[in-house]
Design a protein with these regions (language model features):
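N-terminal low-complexity, acidic/polar interaction/targeting segments
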Residues: 1-224
Length: 224
């Protein structure tokens, strides 16, 4: 769930991989299966350059123009390919880890896939010491009540007990625990980091788990 933290140079452009059911967050890792020829070309392009792909959410009505230029939410998460498997028939399996939020401000033509022109998404980030209450609240969620003793809660509590920042931990929690896609996209786009964390806390608190809860960890592979 949690890779080594780092600061990344912002890429002003990246291939776009739009899907209707995935919202990637920084630090989160998603398993993907690439089978469409245009996205096989996207993978080859990414691997030949900086191994970056911008995950975008398709907007309602995308079905009408899926093979053309369907509408996307302009807030995306740029991810880096951690590893990949190129299958004999041209398909790919890969793990993509989110790095940064970005805004799509334009697109470049000339490829069978879409390439986004990007600018950094603005964020107001408090000092870590100012988020102590939010971090404590997050840890309490996974140590008490319905989440206690679940496998994913143990992973997340261990994560919160380490050196990961509270905003990064909250992003991981949102990616792994929330199912509401519009809510997740709204959280990805939320520029006020404290408010984002508080909204994630509220959303996770409102989840009602079945008894017993079937583990959703590790996450399943998603296909294009």
């Amino acid at each position: 769930m949690d890779a080594t933290p780092g600061q990344y140079d912002f890429a002003p452009a990246a291939p776009l991989f739009p899907l209707p059911n995935i919202v990637l967050f920084p630090r989160a890792v998603v398993a993907l299966h690439i089978f469409e020829s245009r996205y096989q070309a996207m993978m080859a392009h990414a691997l030949a350059h900086d191994s970056l792909i911008a995950m975008a959410l398709l907007l309602p009505g995308w079905e009408k123009d899926y093979y053309g230029h369907p509408p996307i939410d302009p807030v995306v998460c740029v991810g880096a390919i951690l590893n990949h498997e190129h299958l004999p028939d041209g398909r790919y399996n890969l793990l993509l880890q989110g790095r940064v939020r970005a805004h799509v401000v334009g697109e470049r033509a000339g490829h069978p896939f879409r390439i986004a022109q990007l600018t950094p998404a603005p964020e107001s980030i408090p000092e870590e010491s100012d988020l102590a209450n939010e971090r404590t609240h997050l840890r309490e969620i996974f140590r008490h009540g319905q989440w206690r003793n679940t496998e994913i809660a143990r992973h997340l509590d261990k994560c919160l007990g380490g050196t990961i920042s509270t905003p990064d931990a909250a992003d991981l929690i949102a990616f792994n625990l929330l199912d509401d896609i519009p809510l997740k996209q709204s959280l990805l786009a939320e520029p006020d980091v404290r408010r984002r964390i508080q909204r994630i806390i509220a959303a996770v608190t409102e989840i009602h788990l079945p008894t017993p809860r079937r583990s959703n960890w590790p996450p399943k592979t998603s296909s294009n």
